[in-house]
Amino acid sequence: MNLEPINNALSHLRMLRSSVGQVFETLGNGVRAEHGEEGKEQKFLQELQELLNGVNSNLREFETCINDLTPPQAPFNLANTAYLSLETNLERQALYPHLVQSYKWHDKLHEYSTFASVLLQQNSLKRSYYTNTKRRRSLPSSHLATPQTVDNLIGSIHFPNMNLKIVRPFMTNAILHITIARVLRAAVILKGLLIEWVTVKGFDESLLDGVDEHWTVSRHQVFRKVQDHAHSAMLHFFSPTLPDLAIRSFITWFRSYLTLFADPCKKCGKHLHNTLPPTWRDLRTLEPYHEECKQ
């Protein structure tokens, strides 16, 4: 629908209303002081005549624009909104222009969605008309490793003054027993190649007697501190894409406790702080620190 003739007619209508308003304003003011004393009535009539001529000119132009308009071929279907003109409540009458605007917006939305549907059905965004059935290879999961894989990984790790032993009390998941010289012993509970729990005890404490011993903490505070730090390191070295590297890094870090009671703190230079040796080992340099000195 061409809206240019309608906009042109509305523009001339505004000009006509403005010129008529000037006529009534001039009549309301009457003869003014600016007309002077001599011939003021004649000047007033001349001014009024010019305004009326402008009204006639605007009226002819407006009629010409009206004649250029083509009536709609069919009446607009407004459904139940056509009865709003019969409503006397001003609050309900205010809904009419908003509903008309909503209908126009809905028509444009339907038109644009139709064009978009036609373009999308042309399949122009695909490189091929055939569906590729090749699926991406799934990454191996670290907790689904076979027992042979775990045995080969642990068997390839060798450090002096450290003994590694694998037991399987439940036939599936392995428990790695670590003995570091005559300093401490630890039980690392594995689920595939994923470290789930670490228990640290003294060399003279029971750890291999039964499964329940793997979940009880040490009676010595120093080894309880080491166990807490081991849990932090377990989370730090966790890597779902490189689980073998995570286990190697954790065992390398844990072996640094070989000098638990020998090396002083790297920061304060003391062996004891609050009656405890340096129980923290730096995750990169493996240097010993007291828990209060590591910050």
From Swiss-Prot:
Chief localization: nucleus
GO annotation, biological process: regulation of transcription by RNA polymerase II
Domain of life: Eukaryota
Keyword Transcription regulation among UniProt keywords: yes
InterPro entries referenced in this protein's UniProt entry, alphabetically: Mediator_Med27
Location of the protein in the cell: Nucleus
Keyword Nucleus annotated: yes
Keywords, ordered alphabetically: Activator, Nucleus, Transcription, Transcription regulation
GO cellular component terms attached to this protein's record: mediator complex
GO MF: transcription coactivator activity
Family per similarity comment: Belongs to the Mediator complex subunit 27 family.
Reported function: Component of the Mediator complex, a coactivator involved in the regulated transcription of nearly all RNA polymerase II-dependent genes. Mediator functions as a bridge to convey information from gene-specific regulatory proteins to the basal RNA polymerase II transcription machinery. Mediator is recruited to promoters by direct interactions with regulatory proteins and serves as a scaffold for the assembly of a functional preinitiation complex with RNA polymerase II and the general transcription factors.
Description of how the protein assembles with itself and partners: Component of the Mediator complex.
Protein name: Mediator of RNA polymerase II transcription subunit 27
Protein's organism: Aedes aegypti
